[in-house]
Amino acid sequence: VAGVIAGAVVSQADAATPGAHHSPQAAAKHVLLLSVDGLHQSDLTWYVARHPQSALARLVGGGTEYTHAHTTTPSDSFPGMVGQFTGGDPGVTGVYYDDTWSRALLPAGTTNCKTAKPGVELDLTEDLDKNKNSIDAGQGLSGLPNSILKMTGNPNALIDPTKLPVDPKTCKPLYPYDLLRVNTVFSVIRQAGLRTAWSDKHAAYDILDGKSGSDIQDLFTPEINSAAIGYPAGDDWTQDNAATEQYDSYKVRAVLNEIDGYDHSRSSHVGTPAIFGMNFQSVSTAQKLPSSEGLTGGYTAKGVPGPLLQKNLAYVDTEVGALLAELAKQHLAGSTTVILSAKHGQSPTDPAALNRIDDGPLLDGLNAAWKKAHPSYQGDLVAHAVDDDGMLIWLSDHSQQAAAFAKKYLLAQSGFGTDINKNKRPFTRSGLTKVYAGAAAAGYFHTKAGDPNVPDIFGISQYGVVYTGGTGKIAEHGGAHADDLAVPLVIYGAGAEAGTRVSKHVETTSIAPTILTLLGLDPAKLQAVRTEHTPVLDVR
């Protein structure tokens, strides 16, 4: 395998799964993956330069840092995380966003599948929860939120099957893990008899569970978009940065328990997982919120973190330090590789560039223009759209002609958005620089035009554009700007050489085969790796 990991590591005190088999070529017995969502490589560089004794500086200085790493396009949480665990981009995995459309599946609740018309929203958000207003997603725990660690490690039990799309072949609901087209590192690691765990923000992250629906033995998914207990009514855990930090801290506690050899709830001693970790959400909210805790959010100038983001970077650093300290305490530092990255970045990092555009009137106008040109057409042209700082649109007419019509219309629209100070700011071309339509959109994602999940329209926005109907956020992700894509990638610990910087371009999809290689497993067992020839990272 290209990029073979350097050196084997002598086993230290270890709570591995009984009977588990590690290859003698394995550099590590455990891989701890940390995704700091929203974090840019530039943020990491900025923080480490000013805090040379920090935990983040320890990772960078003591490991291999890839300074030109990019996440997936679209730069959304779901394709970003799926890419890190499969080695595949959206065109291969079929996962383009957390809220998309399928032309092949049937609407939720369909019982007569022979006559039902295909076409359904694929919603991988809190909307699938049995109770999206509760941090336990409807499990019914008492004493929340402090009792949240008692939440099940099998979150697909908390998904409401009546909300799921229906398979036209079997006429049965499809869970998120049924929608993923390829296998995951969890699948390969389980097949090797090793333990798996992960922690994320929605029950729908059971998409990572693989075709078996159970490849992650301990999946802890407190609902981030539930009502934030102890905060103003109507707020979820993302609308106050202190709440987001509190929420992230529950997941840190889960990972600390796993380092200690327990499951996330600390109720069963099962051994430290071979693959485990979590995502941090608090950097992302510190970038998106105009203000929180009396501090200004986002950036004060291009790439310069403002006071809220600085505070949050320090929070993440403290939590990373706690995880590293626990690994050392359990004598696992020498047998564990820590990987730091992010599902996505955030744009813009220049507050002066911000232009918030309401996409609602643009989509309404497109539907009206299509109706005027095609008066006998039934329904709206736009079947589904998701617009953050990019534009993804699925059309009810999947023809190239309809896609071309939509592209022409969007590129002809002008109007006014709002800048960082809430003043009017003009826009042209619907805030877009380029639009891929129909076959061109499929080509952009390296898939066939017949892919039932690929958007008919993929619009790349002008720098600084955020599609939102209000002024409640100052940044977003999902697009294809450097601010969306340029995330950190640091590999530290077992098998990684200290103080190494790699400046060549790499993709975060390479994390998946690298995890397997570190554990002494065959990265070619990943279907997406075989399809895309995803390289293993050269940890020198």
Which residues does each PLM region occupy?
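Secreted, luminal/periplasmic, and some membrane-associated catalytic domains
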Residues: 51, 67, 74-76, 95-142, ...
